[in-house]
Regions:
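Charged, conformationally dynamic linker/hinge segments
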Residues: 87-203, 207, 214
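Conserved nucleotide-binding/hydrolysis modules and their immediate coupling elements
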Residues: 1-101, 116-117, 136-138, 191-194, ...
Length: 232
């Protein structure tokens, strides 16, 4: 099965999350060991659940097509695979390059822990994308619409008791970069250090502030691949 959705803050008192796993083949069984392929760890689930309307029930077994809710303390990400031991990865759940960007800042220093936890869980849920600028260490949130910024701000305040403020940042495009030429990639990152960031997976992201800057980078560094989705 694979994790297709994560819902953060199911219980605000415990900041709990539920990862939803779609069973694709075989039979899922409670307390049976499963391989978390990305992490290479074996996991057991003593209280998997299924949701019916407002009711949540513990499930002992599930079959292809069923959706199982698994307790998540931060170990899952969307697209993760669970198997009986096979090394298997599902494809088709990429993150696309955002259209809008803003800096996010903690507006209440006394609530730093809540702010950090909220950002982590909301990003894991897929509400938006987070990039950390390697030049100044600032967090950049990328979305496809203005409403997502409002949702993040509302949920941080009402679910995590944290406040944020948004600050403008002029960016044109975020793209993931890779190269088989390690020397050229290193040279690119040094020359473009002001524009380099990391996503939540630790991958290199180029934050171009204009179409011209992006076009020139593509021309000057022929051996670097610029990806506009995270699946490559």
């Amino acid at each position: 099965g694979f994790i297709f959705k994560i819902t953060a803050n199911i219980d605000p008192n415990h900041r709990s999350c539920i990862a939803f796993c779609k069973v694709c083949s075989g039979k899922f069984e409670r307390n049976k060991p499963y391989l978390h392929v990305r992490q290479g760890k074996t996991l057991r689930f003593s209280s998997p659940t299924q949701f019916m309307a407002q009711r949540k029930n513990t499930v002992d077994e599930a079959y292809p097509g069923d959706i199982v809710g698994l307790p998540d303390n931060g170990i899952f990400k969307i697209g993760d695979t669970l198997t009986e031991g096979e090394i298997l990865h599902f494809r088709g759940l990429p993150s696309f390059s955002p259209l809008l960007f803003k800096y996010i800042e903690n507006d209440d220093p006394m609530k730093s822990k809540q702010f950090q936890k909220g950002i982590e869980q909301l990003m894991d849920e897929g509400v938006a994308q987070l990039f950390v600028n390697q030049f100044n260490g600032r967090r950049v949130v990328g979305t496809v619409g203005q409403l997502q910024f409002e949702v993040i701000q509302y949920r941080l305040e009402h679910e995590y008791n944290a406040k944020c403020r948004w600050e403008p940042v002029h960016l044109h495009k975020a793209c993931w970069v890779e190269s088989d030429d390690a020397e050229e990639l290193d040279s690119f990152k040094k020359r473009k250090y002001q524009y380099m960031a990391k996503d939540t997976e630790g991958r290199d992201v180029f934050l171009a502030d204009s179409g011209y800057v992006l076009s020139m980078a593509q021309q000057d560094f022929k051996n670097i691949k610029f990806h506009f989705t995270s699946e490559f």
